[in-house]
Amino acid sequence: GQISMDSVGVEDTAEQLNRLIDIGETMARKYDVVVTNPPYAGMGNLSAKVNEFAKENYPTSKSDLSTIFMERTLSMCKNDCYMSMINIPVWMFLTTYEKLRKSILLNDTYVNMLHLGRGIFGSDFGTTAFVIQKGHIQNYKGSYRRLFDKQGAVDSVETKEQWFFSEKGLYVAKQDELAKIPGAPLAYWASKNFIAAFEGDNLGRLCDLSEGIHSRNNDEFLRLWYEACANRSSLSTFSKAKKWYPCNKGGGYRKWYGNNDYVIDWENDGQHIRNFKKASVGNNRHRFDEGITFTTITSAERTFRYSPEGYLYDMAGPTFFVHNKELMYYILAAFSSKLGYHFLSAINPGVSLKLGEVNNFPIIVENQELGQVDFLSKENVTMCKDDWDAFETSWDFKVHPLVSMSKGLWDATSTAAAMDYFYGYLPEASCPLEICYLLWQGQCKERFEKLKANEEELNRIFIDIYGLQDELTPEVEDKDVTVRKADLQRDIKSLLSYAVGCMFGRYSLDVEGLAYAGGEWDSSKYQSYIPDADNVIPITDEEYLNDDIVSRLCAWLKVVYGADTLEANLDYIAKALGNKGSTSREIIRNYFLNDFFKDHCQTYSVTGSGKRPIYWLFDSGKQNGFKALVYLHRYTPDTIGNLRIDYLHKMQRVYESEINRMQDMMDHSGNAREVAAASKRKDKLAKQLKECREYDEKISHLALSRIELDLDDGVKVNYRKLQTAQDGKFYEVLADSKNIMVKEKK
């Protein structure tokens, strides 16, 4: 029959409705088994509508689509039936998913789990596959497989398959016991004694743990300590009348003491940062108190360090403050022992550790062991501080160890006794510098072995206290010992860096620590070795000048180790460096020309900071026409002008003279090989001269601008400022500008 206008589309609509009804019935139906590979997406990547839906309907699992699917698929199971899934493992430990874990532990049953770690899908986020039974079975023991050795390690599928069939990482865990661990992490490997430890005191009852400052603009408020003017910094001696204060900010793997890299602007009780709307300054109660600090975000093993009085701390380096000071070193030792990693890897093995999770750490105080633990812990802090302070990146650095060792060389008897103590015999040495290195090497080895022995003894004590003899052993691997062994090339390079510091007056052979890092210059500090007068040290590819960096190094070595052993010391340095060259001076010259500034930038940086050099390299380009170092803290508006007139123009005259000499040799020599060599060198010199003239044109704009720098602005800002003329144009005259200076504001 005919179709009226009223019935048009009714059949299509009915078909769509029937489809929706089918879907609804399917979703409402209960199943014996539900299996899925869920979508992985955090709520931050999804729309506001999806977020709102998740909060309303899945408040327990709302943080990720994959965990929402866990909750939803369980609801689709009949009682006593099964849900199985492959998922990423973040839900097993993070506090964000604590409610979901508790819900499953209390209401359902983990039948089995394959905790695969990373590698199943390449360099992934990790994988876990599991079966959960709907409904709780009391005292049920689930079967778990842990198919990775180290958190974060990426292993091949073949390796995991081999481990699986060899029954590696097989655990049987009673689910009701797992629920007793605070935060309900799925720590299926936890033993009875491990779980029992949580029944006593925890860190939260013995300490105040504070998150600290959240500046929300690190470039504005934070500096690496050596960027700032020393007179405006409260470093070794606490003072409330300064601008820059030490700030714990986490850092890499280091136990007991160290990672003291940053200072924060806290002038006038933090007025600047308090006035920044986005910032929060945390709790006032323990500001500047001594405590224990750690790194919140790290993929490596988490480490804990003593924090002296006078420090602030931010979110990346929270600090806890022990109520009873007599327990501080005991608690530090517990966290720094194998116990620390063992418990924290159960509480949260992820890269980010929350403060509440640290508060759950169980602390068992054994009074009979308190004195011994306290003694060993303090000794470890002292040794690690000595190690940290032996390098110039510590603000408590006094003198380079290879220089301090030289002061005792006059006493041959005591030197021989020290050698016999460290080595059991008197090793041969080619020069005074080698003797100093051997003494330093012995000292480092002794410290390393003593710290390792102390840590193993602390491990033994805490393993016994917590009853974990079946799970942990006290032995410590060399790679996990914080203090550094001697390293010839590293230590010779650091000696050259210290020598350059003496050339600029940052250090003095007559006073310990920083001799000058801003403020008023005091010439009385420099008697044995006089620093460069105008703060410019040229680096040349040949011996053109009598005041270049190699000449100055030779003068410095004579003062430190004696003039009669200069050549032997130069040979020792050159051999350690391993650079190209036919003579010791040439090898050292090539190091300064090609590698010193790279090493300096690497030394004066920490993870995430970018390069923050304090000795700046004026560099004309690839031809090495002109290179000179300038010390940031001695810079004045006249520095560039002096550098241009007294050094750059001087090098141009040198090149012109040498070009004429090569031409004269070509014109008058009858030796073909000599003529060819002169021609080749003339071409090189011509390129260097051309580069210098082009560089002179750029640097003249900056010299005329007489640029002022403010140390408070930091290296990144000042590196750009120094290369920006009065007319606002940028002239690149410093090395590696792209990777050092702050990005241009658009």
Where are these regions (language model features)?
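C-terminal, active-site-flanking charged/polar segments
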Residues: 129-136, 326-328, 338-341, 352-353, ...
